[in-house]
Amino acid sequence: MKYIYTVFLLVTIVACKSNLEEIKPTLVTEKTPHDTDDPAIWINKKNPEESIIFGTDKDEVNGGVYAFDLDGKIILEKSLTKVSYPNNVDVEYGFVLNDSTTTDILVFTEREKHQIRVYSIPDMKPLDKGGFQVFEDENNVEMKRPMGVSIYKNPENGNISAIVSRKSGPSDGYLYQYAFVSDSLGVHSNLIRKFGKFSGEKEIEAIVVDDALGFVYYSDESVGIRKYHASPKKGNAEISIFGGEHFKRDIEGIAIATYQGDRGFLIVSDQQDHSFNFFSRSTNSFVKKLNLGTLETDGCDVTTEALGSKYPNGLFVSMNDEQDFFFHALDSLKIAK
C-alpha cells in the first residue's frame, strides 16, 4: 500500500509540474542520504575549476553538509556529517582572524540544536567552539529553531555578519543579525539587531543579501518577497514587499545573479509550481518564469563568475526533491546581462 501511495504521489507531482518548456540541467549531482534543502557555491579564487558546491541534507541525527565538485560528485573529505538537522547554508570570503590572516567561511543553521555553525573553507575546520546559539532570548522553543541564513559583508569596512530566520516568530523582529568578530580568544557571534516583518502565514526560511547594493531579501512564503537594508545603521524600516502575485503557493529559495553596477536578477523558487521567477535586481520588477526541471525546490544559489571550461559564464544550482541538486550552466538560462 505504501508503494502504491508513493507512486501516486510522484505521478501527481510530475503531472502538476509547470507547463513551461523544461531547460534540462547540465548535470545532476550524486544523491545524499536523507533530504536535500539548500546549496551554496564556494569559488576557489586560485583555481575556479576546483570550486565546491555545498548542500545541506536534513536529518535530526545524521544530517550533513555535503561538498560536491563541479562534476556533481560528493567530496567526502570536505563534507560534514552527523549534524542535527542542517537547514540552510551560505559562504563568505575574507573573514579576518585575530592574527590578521583571512579565511573563507561556511555558515549553516543547525536547527535542532538552536545554533549556527561556522567553518573555514577549504580546510573545513570549526571556528565556533561547537556552535553559536541563536534566538536565546526567546522562551518558546519553536521560536528558537533556526532555518535560513545569509551572510552580509559590508563593502565599506569588511565586517561580516549573519542574518538568521527561524521556524516560527513574531510579526516583527522575525530575523536576528549576528556579527562575527575574532580576537585572542577565538571567533565570537554578537547579536546586533532584530528586524523583519512576518505575515503570520506559513514561515520565513529563504534569505539572500546583495552585498554590493546593501539590501537583504527574504521570502515571507505566502505573501511576497520583503526587502530591507542589510546594514543596521540604515534602519529597520521595510523598503518594499513584492512579487507575491507571480507564485502558485510557497515562495522559497532566493539567489542573486549579479552583473556590473546594479544589473542582474533575483531568482526565486516557486515551489509548488516547480519553477523559478526572475526579478530585476535594480527595480525588482518581474522579468520571466523558467522551468528548470526540479521538483519542490527549497534552496538555490548562483554565480556569474567563470568556473572553468564547463561553466565559463557562471553556474546556477538548485535543490531537487529527490535527494540531489541540479547544476545549470548559466548560459542555458538565457538571461541577458
Where on the chain are the PLM-derived regions?
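Surface loop/turn motifs at the tips and blade-to-blade linkers of beta-strand repeat domains
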Residues: 29-33, 79-82, 137-142, 195-201, ...
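Blade-loop segments of beta-propeller domains
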Residues: 70-114
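Conserved blade-ending motifs and adjacent loop-strand segments that build the rim/top face
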Residues: 241-253, 283-307
